[in-house]
Amino acid sequence: MATAVVPVRKRILKEEDMTKIEFETSEEVDVTPTFDTMGLREDLLRGIYAYGFEKPSAIQQRAIKQIIKGRDVIAQSQSGTGKTATFCVSVLQCLDIQVRETQALILAPTRELAGQIQKVLLALGDYMNVQCHACIGGTNVGEDIRKLDYGQHVVAGTPGRVFDMIRRRSLRTRAIKMLVLDEADEMLNKGFKEQIYDVYRYLPPATQVCLISATLPHEILEMTNKFMTDPIRILVKRDELTLEGIKQFFVAVEREEWKFDTLCDLYDTLTITQAVIFCNTKRKVDWLTEKMREANFTVSSMHGDMPQKERESIMKEFRSGASRVLISTDVWARGLDVSQVSLIINYDLPNNRELYIHRIGRSGRYGRKGVAINFVKNDDIRILRDIEQYYSTQIDEMPMNVADLI
């Protein structure tokens, strides 16, 4: 399938030059300023407006029409700009509701994100009688098989469970017209790469592929050659990916132990709205949660080792505002939409700079203001400077009046 591919660059660059490459949006992409002028079906438009959307965001104005046309699309957009709705609207528009077979497959890196995509599809497709199932690990296989046998127009899921269902012949692929890879940078990272290829091999040869992410490292664009045909690119320059409207600060802590005291001092500030605290390991999340509770602070926590049911109820509590401070690993950083979150604390700086934007992109969604505070030990200074340089941004020392900025 991947034969005629637009060359992404003219010459082979040495590794260190890669960071300077800027990818522009393809010339044939036009802007459609309203949902009404996108040629969408009436029952879908009703769902869009009922969901509370009024005007399409920048990525929606550019990508939806191209996806509906059937083009393979690489779309890059900041966290919090409506990426999920971009492909959900496009998928719903392309369905034949009369045909009770899976016509679109959406892969996501985490169970939570797949579950959220399913919710958005069902909400936007509320007037269409759409059947949509989230196919995710950590849930009952029998339930998946039953739901898939019933007939689902769209399946959203994590690559491992989706491939399992295809192998068991519960998920039939013959009617699939579209494959969407959400948070593709994370998915195509080593962990999911093989599983995506496994899934892809079972899809009909003419399947349309859409790849969506906030960051597109160079290796990802190289990989798109393998399963995209003449893709249209809707990309923002990386320098614009500093999340505007988010004030970023650091707190210098000489030793690891001091981070905890600093966090306790900040607790009253955290609960002004809602806050997410990121740690790099599951053990650290458990340790910090316990330590905060021992000091009589109310916090909830989440990471990938917790049972699915528990993760869901924690998310629900946090979404409803019942819990105000969530301690998590990067499982949370990918595309989860909680609009009240206006403060992010990196208790540990992320292990790679791409994750930084996903973490702080959690706060200030849809142009809301937000604050990110990084706890920095002496040996983290270099990483912080690297992040600053990579995103052409400035991270200042935290002022005393940080509470006034939230």
Swiss-Prot record:
Domain Helicase ATP-binding: 64-234
Keyword field contains Hydrolase: yes
Family the entry assigns: Belongs to the DEAD box helicase family. eIF4A subfamily.
Quaternary structure note: Identified in the spliceosome C complex. Part of the mRNA splicing-dependent exon junction complex (EJC) complex; the core complex contains casc3, eif4a3, magoh and rbm8a.
Enzyme class, spelled out: hydrolase
InterPro entries with a match to the protein in the record: DEAD/DEAH_box_helicase_dom, Helicase_ATP-bd, Helicase_C-like, P-loop_NTPase, RNA-helicase_DEAD-box_CS, RNA_helicase_DEAD_Q_motif
Domain of life: Eukaryota
Matches recorded under PANTHER family: ATP-DEPENDENT RNA HELICASE DBP3
Extent of motif Q motif: 33-61
SUPFAM superfamilies reported in the protein's UniProt record: P-loop containing nucleoside triphosphate hydrolases
A GO BP annotation: nuclear-transcribed mRNA catabolic process, nonsense-mediated decay
Gene: eif4a3
Keywords, comma-separated and alphabetical: ATP-binding, Cytoplasm, Helicase, Hydrolase, mRNA processing, mRNA splicing, mRNA transport, Nonsense-mediated mRNA decay, Nucleotide-binding, Nucleus, RNA-binding, Spliceosome, Translation regulation, Transport
Source organism of this protein record: Danio rerio
Mutant phenotype after disruption: Morpholino EIF4A3 knockdown results in multiple defects in craniofacial structures. Fish morphants staged at 24 hpf show eyes reduced in size, and dark and opaque zones in all brain structures. In addition, the otic vesicle and the midbrain/hindbrain border regions are barely detectable. Cartilage and bone staining reveals underdevelopment of craniofacial cartilage, bone alterations, and clefting of the lower jaw. The third through sixth pharyngeal arches are underdeveloped in morphants.
Subcellular location: Nucleus; Nucleus speckle; Cytoplasm
Entry keyword Secreted: no
Domain Helicase C-terminal: 245-406
Any GO molecular function: mRNA binding
One Gene Ontology cellular component: nuclear speck
Name of this protein: Eukaryotic initiation factor 4A-III
Role played: ATP-dependent RNA helicase. Involved in pre-mRNA splicing as component of the spliceosome. Core component of the splicing-dependent multiprotein exon junction complex (EJC) deposited at splice junctions on mRNAs. The EJC is a dynamic structure consisting of core proteins and several peripheral nuclear and cytoplasmic associated factors that join the complex only transiently either during EJC assembly or during subsequent mRNA metabolism.
Pfam families documented for this protein: DEAD, Helicase_C
Catalyzed chemical reaction(s): ATP + H2O = ADP + phosphate + H(+)
Residues annotated to bind ATP: 55, 60, 77-85, 337, 362-366
Enzyme Commission code: 3.6.4.13
